[in-house]
Structures are given as structure tokens and as C-alpha cells.
């Protein structure tokens, strides 16, 4: 029934005679309920039945039989006790709201207590659950805490509980029951027989009357307020039990404690229970003195500062639940807080997490908390950003002057030993007070307030109405400070109003001035919060001076005036700004008309700021809300914000039982761990040079998270056999230099340098440029959070193309001299670290990422390009290629400082749309002046352009391309979901992390979409363009989404070298200096990047956004999103699990830093070794298809093919089949080959040879599509080898590689890249290349530099080989993981082809090509003979494999000295220091004479990467010099080496 329509009273019998115009009760046309209407006319039908035409109140007419009409009875004739029907008097009554649920009571117990249906129909499920929780504890006579987030309706839940307990019905019955007894007797109705219950509700005064209003709204409660003048009379009524609920304040409770204790309360309900947080406070003592067992606390922030507060609140509600305070501190508080340190050891972290879980279990039955995620679907989007504003020069001078005062010096030295040698601290001995007699503690708070004022606006120091206590102090400070600035003093005297409102005296005011102008243009309505009313005065005067129509609300505003202000602001368009005091406007106000919230200054308590934000961000808000928190850079305000983060993270751990991210080294209250946050030295300090402590801390955590997440995903990607050596994780990092390893070993605990952080974050353009050179000093290869996109800190869902465009641009922007795709690629290759190159995107798989020096030769096939993108111009295609590649590499090469990098889940479709064939340069150069020409050919016109660029660029490009190709291969076999097929490069990072994250936007895109397609003809032009964009957009923030799972942000690492301008044509040939193995690969991506008109429109919108606007504000130094700073992360979850396992289960690594991932127990490793050994013996030919574990293939894949072919209207995608289709086709294959189950078919595939698998694929696919038979054409017969021989050779190579890995920790990088290059060497016949068959043997295990052709080598024991290989892969993880996966659709198919082509490759590798050997120029349609060129190298140098130990280490180095090229076609690699090979290849006496210089020799040897231990390092150096005894010409016996390798491995 429509509740808004009262039900008139009618007689039981209908009236006999009706007349037109009479009032009557007629059935409603909507629901047939009787409602009042009038008779318009009366008619009789042909059957003699009488009908009345009824006119309803809504002017509807209806023909109704007269018999159905009833007479309206006057109210005066009704009996006294039936004045209204139940439905008329129901509470709550919301006429404009529909009932969310059915009108039935909610049973709380079997004895009949229930929430009345009048209330229940408006409740949400979680609110019913909360009422049930309260009722359960009430019945059992014990207390509890309801800790729901703000805005979830704790008040309504309590009222529902009270209604159930008090037996309320929400109808007329409650009215009658509330009547005095004498009236009930007159009505001949017995009073209720149930015992009367009384409840006491204690609330802050600010919400006391709000409770009264809510109780009156939701039910018929007899409520009295014990406060103010009437509290004595009301107290008498309470003693007479004439009320059911008594409302009072904390202060009144203190005054009337004895009277209230004399009463018997059914329960005490305390709102804002976090006020009971200090055990020594008077309010806590009063609350604990209340005589009531059922104590119910309501608080959304039970822990605001430290865990002691939590204990205090819980101990009040449930005395003794958490033990004594000392017990709680020892068992819970200390372990949790110390385990939350960024530098915590595994034991500290594991102990802290275990204590967290124990605490959660203890509190679970007594504490109920839900968060706003329950109602997120009813809330709009919220963007929360921290805006760091630079101080003006005047502010800096004043701030520094305050810090240099004698009083501040007294504060800073107060904890030092007294000069009188008494052994006491200065503040307790001779320096208790200053010259004015003020104690150090008083000075501490006074000067802290002064610094806060200066950080906001210098004019605040001269404002009147200062408290008497500080008046003298402030005057003295002003005299001392402003004595240096007489102009300011004089001006403020002459024109105080102008001075206060002039933004030039405040960096924040400058930002606010432009922000308000921007909001006024966009018709945004702004809520401007400030904690200080004096600051509100300044802001008010500024609004007056600017002619802004504003409203102001603070503590002095009367309650009725508040309602008027809120209504005017929400409804009036002209009023677009409201100045609100943070404390006064924090509760009970509904500013849903505002869509921009500006917090001008932070508070120490995060709850205050959150309450202020919730004034606009709440149910009822229709627009997306933007929250901007202004922070003065480098001042005490930054410490205030970071302490908020510290407290919120601690709250997440203790209250939310989350593995909260560990940002800080500090522990509150600990003298030993004051870290970055606590102690007077952190507060009374001005960070200069524009450095941002917040950025440093967030980036530090981000780098650790990136390493951990890549380590985690790597371990997932690797089959368990590969995890056998995971405990040797330092070996994984040995490929980095000693500095990097030391940094990783200390868990990245130290703050990074300002230069480094400047380049890691999105700062202003000037800072970025300044940091470019310093960035190169960072050891390459370590990746930050941004590059892998793992931390919730900065990233979110990647949705729009426009973000991708921006990231592309930001990539270009990030290197001053390399705007093309080489910039990022080069960086990664220059890293030359297995882990680092590995630590690419989360979306990539780990193929040959570990191959830092690999020669990847990318072959572009014109034919394939035409098939894939026939309609696009060459320029467009080329731009897409470079852009797509650039996108991926942006993330791959993110940061050079990450902790552990093991990438996984790489994808490829966004890679180069055109196959670009890259040849690594022959030499590297450390000298930025020396350049190597990079041959870039355009297939279309056969023009060849020499591009000047650092070898590091080309080398990294090779590495990255190799990585992506092998990642593509990896993808085939591992069951990565289809979502990972697309590399989400459109990272919406709101964090202004590195210049990569700055998401440089192509501004020209707005005017001409074509420019996005057209890549600059020369790199120089691109540099100019990027520089322009960088200047304008270095701080642009992308749209942010608060998703925790979709995290990927680009991060650019910078190089010291000046990257020369490059020209990009359709075909790019890049050379890189390599070791013996060379690889050839041709790669075709699935998807080009699309720049649509829609993306241009979106781009235009973003350009007009507030983010774009803020980016152009000069005073904005840094912006980061606050969206995902608070809370846990997947990386932290992994670290916590690993720590708990290592400490409590495996009893190992307990003192290692928790941020180091050491995995897998020894017993597990031995078990897995045994399993693998047994299985490999069974599957004697180590075929690529043999799969030992779900999702993974146990042995290296010899090759993987990625290909897209189009025949007529059908497109065949080879090697990139989506996961779901692969699974389906695998099942179809099982049926096709008449096998009983998929498992049986899998075993058959596992045991089959390469030819057999290829035949199976051919038979299956040709049965459905005969035209694909041509895809299975074998390579020339002379190259054919049996699959089993291939498999054995893979084992040998794996074993040799393993031995090298064990002896030489740093060799894994060089070998890994050699692995890729060997397999990609251009050995294939031209005919194969022309057919676009993508051939590369991705033997990730073939890291051995010299692979003999002897048959004996091929016949080594498989089990032994696999064992060594497994251990090797676990460390390096390079190509193995990627090569380990075989696409069930195309893996075997391509395997056969490439194995046939492998014989020539084997001949090539058996020659032992040196790392400096010439690189072969391979054109698109002409293949030079690499064997001939290789022979020339052998003729010059002979078998150089014996020097592998000596020269391997320098492949890890980021740079190379220049050296001469042996032939014109050879190109140099740069960014790598010179080693012996470089000197030998320099055919001049000067270079060779360097070998006689002992200093040069020592320098070369010192560049060996820091090993996992000093012992390993000594062994390494010893092996280097011992290897020289054999020198160049001694032949290498592969079988002997394999045996020695195995022994070394043992």
C-alpha cells in the first residue's frame, strides 16, 4: 500500500442511496485499496446494475459498482483509541523514499526479539548484521565495539538494536505503550508486563542532539537529554525510570558520575569511543568507573595514533580481553609495530604478522568493522591527490630563520647529555628553560605551531587574537624573524589587508589562486578546509579581495546558521566556494553540492581529514569528487602527512588485519627507530633543493614491491624444478654490480639520493633535466614499482588509449637525446643484468630477458606487414611499431634500482607491428662522444640511413626485443589468462613518479592525429618535440582508478650518455656486441596500437582537466595519488607469507631482510630434483613438449613461432592462441587421436619427439583447414636433425651453462643474452625468411658459450643435465621460463621447422664466436652467410671460449668503452666498459699497450659483479686468472667441461 496515503475510516456497511457530488470511499485504481474520492455521476447499465463514475484526487475517473462504495465517517465519531490507523503513524516515515525491502520484521532471537518491520525495510544487510552483533553481546551481558567506517550508519544500527530490545513496533502501539500508566488504565489497557530497560548513550556534544533527532525519526522512544540547565530535572525523571534512553555528554557524565552509577543501566553506548584512548586521561577513568557490564563502543577509528589506544578502548569495552597493558605491549604492540618497519627482518615481519593474526582472532568476536566498499556502488568516483607546493623564497627565508633561532637550537639539543657532565639530558639539567623562562616542552609546541603557520602563509605570524600564552613568544619570534625583512613589516603596517590576501607570500596561496580560477571556469564548487581559523581569515580576505562569492562555516557558526549555509551552498550556483573549519565542519554536514575538496593544511590525525572529505564524498553526491591536499614541500607539513600514512597503515594491520605496506623505518615511541618520521630533528628541518621525502619513501617501497612481485610471478612461471635454487637468490642478483647487490642486501632501506629520486619521480621539468645525468650513476637493471606496475601506490586500471599515448610520449620524453623506441630499450639492455632485464613488465614472460648481451636480429618481413596492416602507410606503421615497442619497453626498463626482478606474464601483441630486424653492435662504448652507426633500412625504398646512437641503445633494444620475443614464446605454454595477452601499457598512474609516469602528452595530437602516426625523421627533431612536451607536461597526471589489482605504471630510467639523434625508417638494423651465441628472430605482433579519433577527444578532455592544469602551475613541485597508498598489496602479502614460512616452517633466513625473496626449502628442493631426475630419464628425448607440471613445460623449448597469416578471408594466428582456445583445441586433439582422456594425450605429447608432435599438429589442423598444410613445410633437409639429438644437445648446453653459472655468478647475464643471440643468428635460408616463418630456438638453457659439435656432447645423461639446468634456471630465470612454455597449437609445429634449421646454427656456435665477433647484417630478403664471417673471426682469434670466465663479468656493466670495428658492416655497442675483448679488437698499439698497465688490469677485474658471498667472489677471481693459463688457442672439450661443471654445481 502507498504509505503516503492515509487510510480514511469507513463504515462496515455500504450506504444504500448515493448522490452525485458526495464523498465516498472507493477502490483505488492502482491497488484496489479504499481511498477517498467523489461521485461524479451515477448510471445504470442494461442489466439494471447501478454504477458510479468516481473522480479520484488525482483527477482519474473510474466506473465502480455502487455496492463497492463505502461511506466516509467523520473523525469526531471515532472512538478515542482509534484516532489513527497503524499505517498512519509508522516510524520511520520517508514519503519520498521507496521501501528497499519488504515490510517484515527481522528476527534477532528465537524468543521473539526482532527489529520492527518499519525499520527493517529501510536497513541494508550489513546493518542488520551489525544490529545482530550488538544484540548477541547484549544478551550475553558483555560489551563490544562496532567499528564500521564513517558513513555506514552506526547510529541506525544502534537504534535498530534498541528498538528490538525495547520491543518497539514502530506503530500506534508504541504510542499507547508510552502513555502514562493512568491513561492506560483509563483506556482499560494493562501496562506492559516486561521489565523496563534503560540505556545510557554518551556522545560528544556536537552530535548529542543529532542522536535525539535520529531516535525521534526512527521510532517511538522515550528519550531524555542529561545536559545543560535541565539536567537535574531530567535526572529525576531518569531515576523514576520514566525514560528508556538517556543521552548525555562526556563532560556531564564526569560531573554526574555518582548519580548515574546509582542507576541500573541495561547497557551503556558510547559514541566516538576512540576518545577513551589514553589510559591516564580523566575521561578514560570516568568511563571505566561506570557500573555497567554491557559497554558498547562506536568508533570508525579505534586506532588513531598507536596500539595503546586500541588496547585502552577494548579494555574499557571488554575488560581483560587483551590482558594487561604490559602484556599487550609485549605480545602484540611491539611485534606488530617493529614488523611494520621497512627494514624489518624476516623474523620481525613474520612475528609481527603472527601477532596481528593472534590479535585479530582475539578481537574477532568482540569487534566488528566494515568498510565503505560495501556501498562503493552508490558512491561516485573519488580522486585523492597530494599536491606538494614549493615555498616562496620569502617563505623559505622566514622558515629557515625560525629554525636558526636559539630556542630551536635549544629544542634540538634538549636530548643530548648536559655539558655539566652530570649524565642527565640537557632539558632535565642546566637547560630546562630558555632565557625567558619557558620550558623546552612549551617551546617545542610553540615553535611547531610557528613552523606550520610559516608553511601556510607568513602573514599568519602577524595576525591578532593570538592566545596570551603565545603572544609574547610570537612577538619575540616576529621581531627576530622580520628584522631581516623590514620591507614586509612596513608593507603589512601600511596595507595589512593586501598583505594578508597577497598570494606572493605563500606558495600554497599561489596554487590556490590558480586552482580557484580554474574551478570557476569549469563551474566546480569548492569546499576549502583549514584546521586553523586564522588561516580561514586569510583565505576569507583573499576571497573578498578577489571578488568571490563565498560562505564560511566554523566553530563560531550557530547551528541554525549552519543549516542555512549548507542549503545555500548546495542549491545556489553563484556560491561556488565555502570556507570550512576542519574540526567544526567534520561532522553532520552534507555538502554534496561540492565536487572539489581542498584541504589547505593537514592535521596530525588522519580521521579529521577523512571526515572533512566525507562532507562531500557521501551518498547523495552525483558528481565525481576531486580531493586535493596541499602540502608545503619539505616542511613539517610533509612529516604530518607521512605520520598520517603511518597511523593509517598501522590501523590497517591491527584493525583490518591486512599485510599493510611497510613504508617507514620508524617506530613510534622507539628511541632506536625514529627513522624518517619521529624525533625533533625530523620536525625542525627544511628539506631544500626541492627534494620530496614522500616521493623518496613511496618510490623506495615501490621498487621493493616491483622486485618482489616479479620474483613472485617468476617463481610461479617457473616449474618447481626451476625453484630448486631459488634459495640462491643472491645469485640471481649477482649480475648486478657490487653496489646494486649491496643495496638489495640491505633491503633498499636507505633513502635514495635526491638526484636519483628526482629522476624517479614526476617532478618539474627542470628537476627532471637535472636528474638525467645523475640517473646514469644508478646501476642499471634494478626496476622500480613503476616499471612492473605492481604496487597499488601509483597505478590503476588501464583503460583508455589516451593514456597509452601519454605514456608513449613520456617514454620519448624521458631520455633527452633518445625520443625513439631505443631510449627505453637501450636502457634495459644497458642494464645487462639478468634479473634486471628480467624485471620487465608484469605482462611479459621471461624468456631471454636474462640475455643482456644477446644479439637479437629482428627481421622485418614486408610481406607479413602487408598482410597484417595493408591499409596503413609505412610511416604510420612504423610509428606504431616504435610506439608499441616503446610502450612495452617503458615498463621493462622502468628503474635501475629495483630489488629482485623476475618478470612474468609478459605479452607481446603490442610489440612492433612491423618486424624490425636488429643487429647488436659489435662494441660497446663508455664514452658518450663515441658513436656507433645504427643501420636503419627502409624496405620500401631500400634507402639506408646511418643513425648515430649509443651502443647501449642498440644493445638494450636487442635485449628488450629478445625479451619480448622469448616472452611471446613463454606465453604459449604457460596458462596465462587471456587478460595477460594484452600488455596494458595505458597505465593510469596518478603518481607523479618518474618522468615515465609523467605521461607526457602529445599536445599536437589534438590538432593533428596524423602526427601521432608520423615518427620524426630525425631523432634530433624528436628530441626537440619531447623537450617541449616535457616542459609542458612533466607533471601531468593520468586519470586514476583505485583498483588494487590492475596496477601498471611506466617508469623510465635515464642514461648518462647523450643519446644521439636517430632516424627511424621502416626497417631498423641495430648491432650489439655479443658473446659467441647469436640468435635470429623475427617477431610479428598481433595488435598494432590504435590512435582513434575517440582517443584524440579523450586526450583533449584530459588536456583540459585539473591534472593538466596543475601540471602547469609553477609552484606545484610534485603530485602523487593518495588513492592506493594506504592498505596492503600483493607484494606485501607475498613477503609476509615467505617470512612466515622461512621463520616458522623452514627455520631459515630469519635474519635476512624481509624484502629479500628466498624461497623453497632444501627438502623440497631435493624432492623436486629427484622427481625431475626420474621423469627426465623416462622422457629421454628432452622434447619441448614434455610437461612435468601444470601450466609449464619441464624442458626448454627449442623454438617458438609467432606468426599471423591471412589466406583469403581467413586469418591464422600461429603461436599466440588465446588460453581458452588452446585448452579447447587440446581437448579436441585428444578426441581426434582417439585417446581416452586429456591427461593421456598430454602424456603422449610429453613423450613424443619433435617430429611426432609436429606431425600430430599438422594432421589435426589440416583435417579442419587444409590450407594450413603449407605452414608445416619442413626446412631444407641438409639442416635436419633428429629431435632426440636436439633434445640431448639442449641438455648439454644446459649443463654447460649451469656449470658456468655456478662458477661465474655474473656470467648468467652474458650467457643469457648469448643464448638468445645464438638462436636468432641468421642461419636460416632466405627462402624460409621470405616465407615469414618466425624461427628462433629459444633454448634458454643454452647459455654455454661454446657448444661442441661432438656427438659425445649430445649423449650426456639427461637426468644430470636436467638437474643442473634446473638449478641454473632458478637463478637466472632468463630464457628458461620463457622457453619452457610451448603453445599447444603452434609450439611443436614451429619446433620442427627451427630444429631443421639448427644444424647450421650448431656449426656456427661450434666455432666459438667471440663476444666481439662481427655481427651479420641480414636484410629482409637477402641472408648473408654468417658461417663465413664467423670463420674469419676464428681465423683471427681461434677458439676463445677459454676466456669466457675472464670476460664474462663485464657484460654486466652498464657501459662500454669505444673500440674499433673490424669491418665496415660491424657496429659498436655502447654503454659498456671496455674489457679484454675490446682491447684486443682495437687494432692499434695504444690499446694493446694498455694490457701492460697493471691499473688497467685491476680496473677490469674489479668490475666483476658482487657475488652472493665473499667466498664466491674470491673463487670467481681465482677462476678468472687460472683460466688464463689455457689462453686463446687451447681447444675446448665440451664433455670435460660438462663434467667439471657438474662437479662445480655439486
From Swiss-Prot:
Residues 1-22, 918-949, 1279-1314, 1361-1382 are annotated as: Disordered. GO terms for molecular function: ATP binding; DNA binding; helicase activity; hydrolase activity. Its main location: nucleus. Phosphorylated by NEK6. Residues 135-320 form the Helicase ATP-binding domain. It is found in: Nucleus; Cytoplasm, Cytoskeleton, Microtubule organizing center, Centrosome; Mitochondrion; Chromosome, Centromere. ATP binds at residues 148-155. InterPro entries: DNA/RNA_helicase_DEAH_CS (IPR002464), Helicase_ATP-bd (IPR014001), Helicase_C-like (IPR001650), Heliccase-ass-bd (IPR029256), P-loop_NTPase (IPR027417), SNF2-like_sf (IPR038718), SNF2/RAD54-like_C (IPR049730), SNF2_N (IPR000330). GO terms for biological process: DNA damage response; interstrand cross-link repair. A motif (Atypical PIP-box) lies at residues 780-791. The modification Phosphoserine is found at residues 977, 980, 1370, 1373. Residues 8-22, 1283-1300 have a biased composition (Basic and acidic residues). Residues 511-661 form the Helicase C-terminal domain. Its EC number is 3.6.4.-. A motif (DEAH box) lies at residues 271-274. SUPFAM superfamilies: P-loop containing nucleoside triphosphate hydrolases. Keywords: ATP-binding, Centromere, Chromosome, Cytoplasm, Cytoskeleton, DNA damage, DNA repair, DNA-binding, Helicase, Hydrolase, Mitochondrion, Nucleotide-binding, Nucleus, Phosphoprotein. PANTHER family: DNA EXCISION REPAIR PROTEIN ERCC-6-RELATED, SNF2/RAD54 FAMILY MEMBER. Belongs to the SNF2/RAD54 helicase family. This is DNA excision repair protein ERCC-6-like 2. It comes from Bos taurus. The lineage of its organism: Eukaryota, Metazoa, Chordata, Craniata, Vertebrata. The gene is ERCC6L2.
Amino acid at each position: 500500500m502507498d504509505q503516503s496515503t492515509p487510510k480514511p475510516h469507513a463504515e462496515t456497511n455500504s450506504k444504500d442511496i448515493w448522490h452525485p457530488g458526495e464523498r465516498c470511499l472507493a477502490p483505488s485504481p492502482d491497488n484496489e485499496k479504499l481511498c477517498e474520492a467523489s461521485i461524479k455521476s451515477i448510471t445504470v447499465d442494461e442489466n439494471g446494475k447501478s454504477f458510479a463514475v468516481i473522480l479520484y484526487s488525482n483527477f482519474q475517473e473510474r466506473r465502480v459498482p455502487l455496492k463497492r462504495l463505502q461511506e466516509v465517517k467523520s473523525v469526531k465519531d471515532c472512538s478515542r483509541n482509534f484516532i489513527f490507523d497503524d499505517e498512519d503513524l509508522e516510524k520511520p516515515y520517508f514519503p519520498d523514499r521507496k521501501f528497499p525491502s519488504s515490510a517484515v520484521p527481522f528476527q534477532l532471537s528465537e524468543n521473539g526479539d526482532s527489529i520492527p518491520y518499519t525499520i527493517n525495510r529501510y536497513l541494508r544487510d550489513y546493518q542488520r548484521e551489525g544490529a545482530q552483533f550488538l544484540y548477541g553481546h547484549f544478551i550475553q551481558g558483555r560489551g563490544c565495539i562496532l567499528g564500521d567506517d564513517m558513513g555506514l550508519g552506526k547510529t541506525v544500527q544502534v537504534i535498530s538494536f534498541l528498538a528490538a530490545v525495547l520491543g518497539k513496533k514502530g506503530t500506534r502501539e508504541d504510542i499507547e505503550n508510552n502513555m502514562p500508566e493512568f491513561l492506560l488504565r483509563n483506556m482499560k489497557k494493562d501496562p506492559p508486563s516486561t521489565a523496563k530497560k534503560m540505556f545510557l548513550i554518551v556522545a560528544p556534544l556536537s552530535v548529542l542532539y543529532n542522536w535525539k533527532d535520529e531516535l525521534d525519526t526512527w521510532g517511538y522512544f522515550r528519550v531524555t537529554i542529561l545536559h545543560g540547565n535541565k539536567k537535574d530535572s531530567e535526572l529525576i525523571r531518569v531515576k523514576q525510570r520514566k525514560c528508556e534512553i538517556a543521552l548525555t555528554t562526556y563532560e556531564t557524565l564526569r560531573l554526574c558520575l555518582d548519580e548515574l552509577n546509582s542507576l541500573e543501566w541495561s547497557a551503556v553506548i558510547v559514541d566516538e569511543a576512540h576518545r577513551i584512548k589514553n589510559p591516564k586521561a580523566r575521561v578514560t577513568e570516568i568511563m571505566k568507573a561506570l557500573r555497567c557490564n554491557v559497554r558498547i563502543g562506536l568508533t570508525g577509528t579505534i586506532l588513531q595514533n598507536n596500539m595503546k589506544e586500541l588496547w585502552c578502548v577494548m579494555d574499557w569495552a571488554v575488560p581483560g580481553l587483551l590482558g594487561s597493558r604490559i602484556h599487550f605491549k609485549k605480545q602484540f604492540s611491539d611485534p606488530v609495530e617493529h614488523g611494520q618497519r621497512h627494514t624489518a627482518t624476516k623474523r620481525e615481519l613474520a612475528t609481527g604478522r603472527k601477532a596481528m593474526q593472534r590479535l585479530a582472532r582475539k578481537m574477532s568476536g568482540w569487534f566488528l568493522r566494515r568498510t565503505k566498499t560495501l556501498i562503493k556502488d552508490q558512491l561516485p568516483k573519488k580522486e585523492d591527490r597530494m599536491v606538494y607546493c614549493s615555498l616562496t623564497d620569502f617563505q623559505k627565508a622566514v622558515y629557515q630563520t625560525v629554525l636558526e633561532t636559539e630556542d630551536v637550537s635549544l629544542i634540538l639539543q634538549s636530548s643530548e647529555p648536559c655539558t655539566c657532565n652530570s649524565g642527565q639530558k640537557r632539558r632535565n639539567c642546566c637547560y630546562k628553560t630558555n632565557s625567558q623562562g619557558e620550558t623546552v616542552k612549551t617551546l617545542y609546541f610553540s615553535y611547531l605551531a610557528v613552523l606550520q603557520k610559516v608553511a601556510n602563509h607568513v602573514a599568519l605570524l602577524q595576525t591578532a587574537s593570538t592566545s596570551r600564552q603565545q603572544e609574547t613568544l610570537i612577538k619575540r619570534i616576529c621581531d627576530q624573524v622580520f628584522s631581516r625583512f623590514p620591507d614586509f613589516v612596513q608593507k603589512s603596517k601600511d596595507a595589512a589587508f593586501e598583505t594578508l590576501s597577497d598570494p606572493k607570500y605563500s606558495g600554497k596561496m599561489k596554487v590556490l589562486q590558480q586552482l580557484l580560477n580554474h574551478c570557476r571556469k569549469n563551474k566546480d564548487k569548492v569546499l576549502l578546509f583549514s584546521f586553523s581559523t586564522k588561516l580561514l581569515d586569510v583565505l576569507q580576505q583573499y576571497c573578498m579581495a578577489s571578488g568571490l562569492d563565498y560562505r564560511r562555516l566554523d566553530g563560531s557558526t550557530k547551528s541554525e546558521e549552519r543549516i542555512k549555509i549548507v542549503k545555500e551552498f548546495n542549491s545556489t550556483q553563484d556560491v561556488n566556494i565555502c570556507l570550512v573549519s576542519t574540526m567544526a565542519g567534520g561532522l553532520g554536514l552534507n555538502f554534496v553540492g561540492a565536487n572539489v575538496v581542498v584541504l589547505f593544511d593537514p592535521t596530525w590525525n588522519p580521521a579529521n581529514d577523512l571526515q572533512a572529505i566525507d562532507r562531500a564524498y557521501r551518498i547523495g553526491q552525483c558528481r565525481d569528487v576531486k580531493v586535493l591536499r596541499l602540502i608545503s614541500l619539505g616542511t613539517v607539513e610533509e612529516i604530518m602527512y607521512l605520520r598520517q600514512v603511518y597511523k593509517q597503515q598501522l590501523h590497517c594491520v591491527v584493525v583490518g588485519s591486512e599485510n599493510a605496506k611497510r613504508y617507514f623505518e620508524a617506530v613510534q615511541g622507539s628511541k632506536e627507530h625514529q627513522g624518517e618520521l619521529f624525533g625533533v630533528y625530523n620536525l625542525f628541518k627544511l628539506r631544500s633543493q626541492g627534494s620530496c621525502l614522500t616521493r623518496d619513501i613511496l618510490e623506495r617501497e615501490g621498487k621493493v614491491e616491483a622486485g618482489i612481485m616479479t620474483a613472485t610471478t617468476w617463481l610461479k612461471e617457473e616449474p618447481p624444478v626451476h625453484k630448486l635454487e631459488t634459495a640462491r637468490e643472491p645469485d640471481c642478483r649477482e649480475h648486478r654490480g657490487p653496489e646494486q647487490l649491496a643495496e638489495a642486501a640491505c633491503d633498499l632501506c636507505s633513502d635514495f639520493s635526491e638526484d636519483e629520486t628526482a629522476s624517479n619521480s614526476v617532478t618539474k621539468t627542470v628537476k627532471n633535466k637535472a636528474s638525467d645525468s645523475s640517473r646514469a650513476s644508478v646501476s642499471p637493471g634494478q626496476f622500480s614499482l613503476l616499471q612492473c606496475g605492481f604496487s597499488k601506490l601509483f597505478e590503476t586500471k588501464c583503460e583508455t588509449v589516451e593514456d597509452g599515448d601519454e605514456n608513449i610520449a613520456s617514454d620519448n620524453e624521458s631520455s633527452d637525446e633518445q625520443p625513439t623506441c631505443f631510449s627505453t630499450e637501450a636502457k634495459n639492455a644497458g642494464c645487462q643484468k639478468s634479473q634486471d632485464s628480467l624485471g620487465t613488465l608484469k605482462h611479459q614472460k621471461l624468456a631471454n630477458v636474462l640475455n643482456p648481451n644477446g644479439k637479437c636480429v629482428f627481421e622485418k618481413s614486408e610481406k607479413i606487414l602487408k598482410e597484417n596492416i595493408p591499409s596503413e602507410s609505412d610511416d604510420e606503421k612504423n610509428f606504431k611499431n616504435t610506439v608499441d615497442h616503446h610502450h612495452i619497453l617503458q615498463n621493462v626498463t622502468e628503474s635501475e634500482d629495483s630489488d629482485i626482478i623476475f618478470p612474468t606474464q609478459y605479452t607481446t601483441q603490442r610489440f612492433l607491428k612491423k618486424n624490425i630486424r636488429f643487429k647488436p653492435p659489435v662494441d660497446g662504448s663508455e664514452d658518450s662522444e663515441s658513436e656507433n652507426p645504427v643501420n636503419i633500412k627502409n624496405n620500401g625504398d631500400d634507402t639506408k640511413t646511418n643513425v648515430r646512437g649509443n651502443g647501449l641503445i642498440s644493445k638494450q633494444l636487442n635485449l628488450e626485443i629478445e625479451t619480448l620475443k622469448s616472452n611471446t614464446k613463454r606465453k604459449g605454454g604457460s596458462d596465462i589468462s587471456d587478460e595477460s595477452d594484452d600488455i596494458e601499457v595505458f597505465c593510469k598512474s596518478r603518481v607523479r613518479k618518474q618522468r615515465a609516469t609523467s605521461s607526457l602528452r602529445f599536445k599536437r595530437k589534438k590538432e593533428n592525429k596524423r602526427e601521432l602516426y608520423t615518427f620524426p625523421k630525425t631523432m634530433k627533431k624528436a628530441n626537440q618535440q619531447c623537450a617541449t612536451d616535457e616542459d609542458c607536461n612533466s607533471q601531468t597526471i593520468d586519470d586514476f582508478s583505485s583498483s588494487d589489482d590492475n596496477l601498471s605504471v611506466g617508469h623510465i630510467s635515464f642514461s648518462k650518455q647523450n643519446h644521439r639523434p636517430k632516424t627511424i625508417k621502416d626497417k631498423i638494423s641495430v648491432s650489439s656486441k655479443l658473446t659467441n651465441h647469436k640468435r635470429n628472430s623475427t617477431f610479428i605482433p598481433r595488435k598494432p596500437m590504435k590512435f582513434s579519433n575517440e582517443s584524440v577527444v579523450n586526450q583533449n578532455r584530459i588536456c583540459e582537466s585539473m591534472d593538466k592544469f596543475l601540471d602547469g602551475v609553477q609552484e606545484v613541485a610534485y603530485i602523487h595519488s593518495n588513492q592506493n597508498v594506504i592498505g596492503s598489496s600483493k607484494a606485501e602479502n607475498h613477503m609476509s607469507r615467505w617470512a612466515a614460512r622461512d621463520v616458522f616452517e623452514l627455520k631459515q633466513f630469519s635474519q635476512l631482510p624481509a624484502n629479500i625473496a628466498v624461497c623453497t626449502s632444501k627438502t623440497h628442493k631435493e624432492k623436486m630434483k629427484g622427481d625431475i631426475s626420474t621423469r627426465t630419464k623416462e622422457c629421454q628425448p628432452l622434447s619441448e613438449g614434455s610437461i612435468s607440471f601444470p601450466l609449464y613445460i619441464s624442458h626448454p623449448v627449442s623454438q617458438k613461432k609467432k606468426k599471423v597469416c591471412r589466406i583469403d578471408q581467413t586469418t591464422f594466428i600461429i603461436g599466440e592462441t588465446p588460453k581458452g582456445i588452446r585448452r579447447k583445441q587440446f581437448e579436441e586433439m585428444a578426441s581426434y587421436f582417439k585417446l581416452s582422456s586429456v591427461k593421456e594425450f598430454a602424456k603422449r605429447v610429453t613423450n613424443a619427439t619433435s617430429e611426432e608432435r609436429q606431425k600430430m599438429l599438422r594432421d589435426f589442423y589440416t583435417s579442419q583447414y587444409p590450407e594450413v598444410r603449407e605452414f608445416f613445410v619442413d626446412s631444407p633437409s641438409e639442416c635436419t636433425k633428429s629431435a632426440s639429438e636436439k633434445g640431448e644437445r639442449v641438455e648439454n648446453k644446459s649443463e654447460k651453462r649451469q656449470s658456468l653459472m655456478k662458477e661465474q655468478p655474473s656470467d648468467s647475464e652474458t650467457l643469457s643474452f648469448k643464448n638468445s643471440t645464438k638462436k636468432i643468428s641468421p642461419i636460416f635460408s632466405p627462402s624460409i625468411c621470405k616465407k615469414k616463418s618466425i624461427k628462433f630456438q629459444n633454448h634458454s638453457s643454452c647459455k654455454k658459450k661454446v657448444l661442441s659439435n661432438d656427438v659425445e656432447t649430445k649423449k650426456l645423461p639427461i637426468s644430470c643435465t636436467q638437474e643442473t639446468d634446473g638449478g641454473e634456471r632458478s637463478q637466472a630465470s632468463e630464457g628458461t621460463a620463457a622457453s619452457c612454455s610451448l603453445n599447444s597449437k603452434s609450439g611443436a609445429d614451429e619446433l620442427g621447422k627451427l630444429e631443421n634449421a639448427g644444424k647450421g646454427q650448431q656449426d656456427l656456435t661450434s666455432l666459438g664466436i667471440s663476444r666481439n665477433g662481427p655481427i651479420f647484417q641480414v636484410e629482409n630478403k637477402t641472408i648473408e652467410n654468417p658461417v663465413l664471417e664467423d670463420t674469419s673471426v676464428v681465423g683471427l682469434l681461434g677458439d676463445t671460449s677459454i676466456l669466457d670466465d675472464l670476460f664474462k663479468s663485464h657484460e654486466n656493466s652498464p657501459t662500454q668503452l669505444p673500440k674499433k670495428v673490424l669491418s665496415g658492416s660491424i657496429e659498436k655497442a655502447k654503454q659498456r666498459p671496455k674489457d679484454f675483448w675490446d682491447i684486443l679488437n682495437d687494432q692499434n698499439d695504444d690499446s694493446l699497450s694498455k694490457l701492460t698497465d697493471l691499473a688497467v688490469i685491476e680496473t677490469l677485474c674489479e668490475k666483476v659483479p658482487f657475488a652472493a658471498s665473499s667466498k664466491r667472489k674470491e673463487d670467481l677471481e681465482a677462476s678468472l686468472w687460472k683460466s688464463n693459463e689455457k689462453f686463446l688457442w687451447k681447444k675446448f672439450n665440451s664433455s670435460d667441461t660438462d663434467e667439471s661443471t657438474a662437479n662445480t654445481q655439486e
